Amino acid sequence: MGAVSRVRSQLALGQAGEKAAADFLKRRGYEVVGAGFTARRGEIDLVCKRGRDLVIVEVKTRTSTAFGTPAEAVGTRKRKALAAAASEYRLLAGWKGPIRYAIVGLVSKPDGGFDAELIEDPFQ
């Protein structure tokens, strides 16, 4: 597979993962209010509400766990970028309530579906 094909394949996997994550969260009582918010210093995959909280969701999609779980790919740099993006989102949206974070880790299955894991408040 060439470099361009590999990038297209990764983008398609990521897009499918974000849709699957949104569906997964809806089934668990989250209201998805935004997706793909790009800030100056980071990106938010999904913005949800649950109860009175705004939940900033990082979606990590992988084809296997050979190099660790998807959630393990969220390191310090990504955490800082998420926090910066959340601050910017808060200002632009005028959000005054609490903000929490979550990670949805997805691993693709041979049938085209995903195994999903939700980690709520992963940075505490």
Identify the meaning behind each predicted range:
Residues E18, E43-D45, E58, K78, ...:
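Acidic active-site catalytic centers that drive phospho-/nucleotidyl reactions
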Residues L25, I44-P70, V74, L82:
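Conserved catalytic cores of phosphodiester-cleaving nucleases, focusing on short active-site segments
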Residues A35-T38, E43-I44, V104-V107:
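Short, solvent-exposed loop/turn elements at beta->coil junctions and helix N-caps
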Residues Y30, A35-T38, T61-R62, G68-A81, ...:
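Amphipathic, hydrophobic secondary-structure cores in small proteins
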Residues M1-A35:
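Acidic-basic catalytic patches of nuclease active cores, encompassing PD-(D/E)XK
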Residues R8-A16, R41, T65, T69-K80, ...:
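Residues at secondary-structure transition points
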Residues L92-Q124:
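Domain-level recognition of nuclease-like catalytic cores that cleave nucleotide substrates
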